[in-house]
Regions:
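Acidic, low-complexity intrinsically disordered tails
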Residues: 1-14, 687-696, 731-765
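Electropositive polyanion-binding surfaces
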Residues: 39, 190, 195-197, 214, ...
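A short macromolecule-binding patch
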Residues: 103-108, 169-175, 673-690, 738-740
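Intrinsically disordered, low-complexity linker and terminal regions at domain boundaries
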Residues: 119, 679-722, 726, 738-754
Length: 765
């Protein structure tokens, strides 16, 4: 590399390239002569000037600069200044996601301007280097994602520090001793930034705003996760006070204005630990032989007035948050668990969709009305499942219970009603999949927790027929409500409504999925109509059901899907194959449902269409908060996973490879489904190359292969609660154990032990 001097310091080509890129990026549209460039950058020596000219030639070749004349350049007009969201990673692989796009652009630490995860930034693309990787440079931080951060305090005599995860700051936060607020070393604390870093090596300055408690305490750790994502871990007293003043009494006027369903069989079906009962189902036989099924939803909007102090807090939260061991409700407890909750043997106000269904579950009629209900029974999913199976239902087959006869009457309290609901739900489900809905039945990780919050067991929970019974009627109600507003005559504009939309899958991601499943011997079509894509996905899900790779394939398939979100601009829902879909059925825990309730009432009374721009902004906020809540939930799962494995260091388990990266192998233990990483630096028998296209690592000398889905034996090496990370090491026969894999997935050789050094990759997922 050429060397030169600037201000008495030697400078190489890479350093001068960065300086020139920054120089031109700050002067878009200006034509700059060599003379101006040399003078502005203090390039005084002949070698340095010649090096600068060579670099500018290369930048022009890369289309970063446009050559105006033999001795002048300007920033290429196509190199526009863009805006996007910055993503910071602990392994230094930072990136920026341009507005309106999904693919991240790499940003090196030196070009990040100290941007934090989630910051909105202005950036430009850099000239491509020899590796041809697209790279960006942050020019300005437009908006900080947040100004408060959570971490562990380290208190010294004169200064204190907040130690944060590597994906937050490149440096720890310095806290003046007088601003520690009584915090001690190893306390978890919330710190507000009072002075942002303005240089590459400068740490931010902060002040403690809340001490959460000592690290390791369960409540402290869960509250730390909430605080990390800016989620509330306390309920404001003034909001609680306002909720306590709300009367749960049903007035004579309420009875007059509502349909009375108190004498119709009604029940709730929920998880065993649920307290907020959003929805209830009623059923009765009509004189014409059809069935009247009521989907009754807690009438939150009756009690929470738009613009009230409770409503403002609900808007801010937008959703309830579900951590492993607790729920952080969107509404105050008095509302969500008592007044609004559809508790058994209590009269409750509801917003209901009443369906008339024939025996094939075809909707013959419906109405959307305010009601008064009284639930006869609070069922747990397990109780309904037990009743169904006791009457001949085989879970997962899609077949209802056999018809009741005098010789074989249905067994169990309210058996006829529940079995009829199940039969109708199964017909609705079959029709939905026939129409092109995508079938994802992924198992969810659950923990059994003791009274101190410590996990004592870890297992996957699968959705059974009882869950699907409730799900189908909720889907039907949500779709019907959306159609009632959105489905209008051609040429007429529908009134504003928040829809739940799900765009078609990204074709490139579908192709990646196709290439992946081929390695397991499966075929998949990625071209054709939406319906053809859905049918191909469903066939794939059916083919891999019950196989060791099932969860893995479902995970990769889900990554090929777009994220569902809220919007007033309806594009339909790909996954459900619904042209119109909204969220109406969970107003206790989702704010969009409350918005829909209010708009339905307004439009039923002849009101004009609501402000589209205002509701789109609310939709965007709710979508963002939903994602944040999901991230917090995942972090709580990771924490409990590490805590659960903490006393199993050195133990060996059978596992499957669930992720392959350039810095290591992710593996999921078969027995308890906990996931950890085997760092690349610890696979010391060879130098491994990451084959991203084929989802595998291949050794250069011995050609051993580690591939997604492979069976391996691991040993628990480390459980880091602070980072929420498990480290594994290969154990026993450390090469993948291949069992009856197709030819496309070749067998590995046994791993040969050696001391050859390998890359030292920092970890992140």
């Amino acid at each position: 590399m050429g060397k030169g001097k600037k201000g008495g310091k030697r400078m190489n080509k890479a350093q001068l390239t960065e300086i020139l890129q920054q120089f031109f990026a700050e002067r878009p549209g200006e034509t700059l002569s060599f003379k101006e460039i040399f003078r502005s950058l203090h390039l005084t020596t002949h070698p340095l000037k010649m090096l600068a000219i060579d670099i500018m030639e290369e930048m022009a070749w890369d289309d970063y600069l446009a050559k105006v004349s033999d001795n002048s350049y300007r920033l290429n007009q196509s190199v526009q200044v863009m805006e996007g969201k910055f993503v910071r990673k602990a392994n230094g692989k930072n990136s920026v996601i341009p507005d309106g796009e999904e693919n991240p652009i790499f940003v090196s630490e030196r070009n990040s301007m100290g941007a934090l995860n989630g910051d909105r930034v202005e950036f430009t693309f850099l000239a491509r280097r020899k590796n041809h990787i697209k790279e960006a440079q942050v020019n300005k931080i437009l908006e900080r994602a947040k100004d408060t951060f959570v971490g562990r305090l380290k208190v010294d005599k004169d200064l204190a520090y907040l130690v944060t995860p590597g994906d937050v700051f490149a440096h720890n936060i310095i806290i003046p001793r007088r601003k520690v607020k009584g915090g001690k070393t190893d306390d978890k604390a919330v710190v507000r930034i009072i002075e942002w870093p303005d240089g590459e090596n400068k740490s931010p300055i902060g002040e403690v705003v809340d001490i959460l408690g000592q690290k390791g305490d369960n409540d402290v750790e869960m509250n730390s996760i909430l605080a990390q994502y800016g989620l509330p871990y306390k309920y404001p007293k003034n909001v609680e006070d306002a909720a306590n003043k709300i009367s749960g009494e049903i007035t004579e006027q309420d009875y007059k204005e509502r349909e009375d369903f108190r004498k119709v069989f009604t029940c709730t079906i929920d998880p065993k630990d649920a307290k907020d009962f959003d929805d209830a189902l009623s059923i009765q036989r009509l004189e014409n032989g059809n069935w009247q099924v009521g989907v009754h939803i807690a009438d939150v909007s009756h009690y929470v007035t738009e613009g009230s102090i409770i409503d403002k807090e609900a808007v801010k939260r937008a959703t309830s948050v579900y951590l492993v061991d607790r729920t952080i409700p969107m509404l105050p407890e008095r509302l969500c668990n008592f007044i609004c909750s559809l508790r058994p043997n209590e009269e409750k106000l509801a917003y209901s969709v009443i369906f008339e269904l024939n025996n094939n579950a075809e909707v013959k009629n419906y109405r959307i009305v305010h009601t008064v209900i009284e639930s006869d029974r609070r069922y747990k999913y397990e109780e309904v499942q037990e009743l169904l199976e006791a009457n001949g239902v085989i879970d997962g087959t899609g077949e209802p219970a056999p018809a009741e006869t005098k010789e074989h009457p249905y067994q169990g309290e309210n058996a006829l009603q529940l079995i009829t609901l199940d039969r109708l739900a199964k017909k609705l489900r079959a029709a939905r999949f026939k129409n092109g809905a995508v079938k994802f039945d992924r198992e969810e990780l659950h923990f059994d927790i003791d009274e101190k919050g410590k996990p004592i067991s870890c297992y996957y929970k699968r959705s059974k027929d009882a869950n699907k019974l409730v799900e189908e009627f909720m889907l039907l109600a949500n779709r019907t409500v959306a159609e009632s507003i959105g489905k209008v005559k051609k040429g007429k504009k529908p009134k504003t409504l928040p829809y739940r939309i799900h765009d078609n899958p990204d074709p490139q991601k579908l192709e990646t999925l196709r290439e992946f499943v081929v390695k397991f011997g499966y075929k998949m079509k990625t071209e054709g109509t939406k319906g053809a894509t859905a049918r191909s996905l469903n066939k794939l899900m059916a083919d891999c059901e019950g196989k060791p790779e099932n969860n893995l394939i479902q995970m990769v398939a889900l990554r090929a899907m777009m994220k569902a979100k809220y919007s007033v601009h309806n594009i339909g829902h790909f996954g459900l194959a619904f042209e119109y879909y909204t969220h109406f059925t969970s107003p206790i825990r989702r704010y969009p449902d409350t918005m829909v309730h209010r708009l339905l009432t307004k439009y039923a009374q002849g009101g004009r269409s609501a402000n589209e721009k205002h509701y789109e902004e609310l939709c965007e906020h709710c979508s963002d908060m939903e994602q944040i809540a999901q991230n917090a939930e995942r972090d709580s799962i990771k924490y409990k996973m590490v805590e659960f494995m903490g006393d199993k260091l050195g133990e060996e388990f059978d596992a499957h490879i669930s992720g392959i990266t350039s810095y290591g192998i992710y593996a999921t233990i078969d027995e308890n489904h906990c996931e950890g990483m085997i760092p690349m630096r610890d696979i010391a028998d060879d130098y491994y190359d990451f084959d991203e296209k084929n989802f595998c690592l291949i050794g250069r000398r011995h050609h051993n292969k580690y591939q997604l889905g492979d069976a391996i034996r691991i040993k628990v090496a480390q459980a880091n609660l602070e980072k929420k990370q498990l480290d594994f090491a290969l154990a026993g026969d450390s090469a993948p154990i291949r069992k009856e894999k197709p030819e496309a997935s070749t067998s590995s050789e046994k791993t040969k032990k050696s001391k050859q050094k390998t890359r030292n990759h920092r970890r992140n997922k």
